């Protein structure tokens, strides 16, 4: 079997070269495309927490690949177990990380654990690519000709191993000739929409216009939004969804304006052990992300020094506000969710 140390693997934002894991620095985009080495647990955790590598699926994949590489380098099972624990705690909200690490932990328990971990990590990458494609196919079928769609945060190849979740839907709809344009929320405070989604859509040739988050309501009121598409960091057993802060606001606005609100995510984002949105841990981030802005363009501080800040990275959208959960298995309706689709017994 080919080992990771001899394999050249690359996605939009991850690559393995000469047995080393590299990540595309998503804090530097779109001004600079820089690849950073992530060859230790400490360095990867730092990159994850600094959002240089981000997106629920991609975080899980980067952790899995690094563990497999460390196993091939001779790290003991005991140290790999410690690495699993440390990586699991690096970001609390995205459940894909926990799900991927659970599979890597099972591989670690196998008699041939080194080869088992390499095989499992590669399997996770291949699966994610396939899951993205299925989500895109199911979602694109919901897009009517001439649609103006609105999206939030970043859900494309930068956040996955494939074409993305919500952005994958937009791509396939565009290729099928049904997409007029995309409204891109800038996504405060870290501007993932303005920096990353705008860059990705431009690279894909998809027409878009960038808006401030607060402009979405006006667009909806004037009939300029036909549907909203977002991703997810965790789906609870009752269908509640945790996603980038600002998602809940869009869902409330969509409900008021009677606009479809779709969540596109792989089944690996579902957490059957989490009963509802109230049980989802919400990461709190640094005040500096709100009092100023940083990135490939440098840093600008605009708020007074020592300003008190509340900065949750995610919010929870209640299932009652969601028109459909577009998974790799198909489009799940509110009626199916109410009947217990996401409950543990399923």
Swiss-Prot record:
Residues annotated as the enzyme's active site: 233 (proton donor)
Top class in the EC scheme: isomerase
GO molecular function, one term: S-methyl-5-thioribose-1-phosphate isomerase activity
Top-level taxon: Bacteria
This protein's pathway: Amino-acid biosynthesis; L-methionine biosynthesis via salvage pathway; L-methionine from S-methyl-5-thio-alpha-D-ribose 1-phosphate: step 1/6
Keywords associated with the record: Amino-acid biosynthesis, Isomerase, Methionine biosynthesis
UniProt site positions, description: Transition state stabilizer: 153
GO BP of this protein: L-methionine salvage from methylthioadenosine
Pfam families cross-referenced by the UniProt entry: IF-2B (PF01008)
Binding residues annotated for substrate, in chain numbering: 54-56, 91, 192, 243-244
Keyword Amino-acid biosynthesis: yes
Catalytic activity: 5-(methylsulfanyl)-alpha-D-ribose 1-phosphate = 5-(methylsulfanyl)-D-ribulose 1-phosphate
EC number(s) stated in the UniProt entry for this protein: 5.3.1.23
PANTHER family associated with the record: METHYLTHIORIBOSE-1-PHOSPHATE ISOMERASE
Family, per entry: Belongs to the eIF-2B alpha/beta/delta subunits family. MtnA subfamily.
Function: Catalyzes the interconversion of methylthioribose-1-phosphate (MTR-1-P) into methylthioribulose-1-phosphate (MTRu-1-P).
The name this protein goes by in its record: Methylthioribose-1-phosphate isomerase
Record organism: Yersinia pseudotuberculosis serotype IB (strain PB1/+)
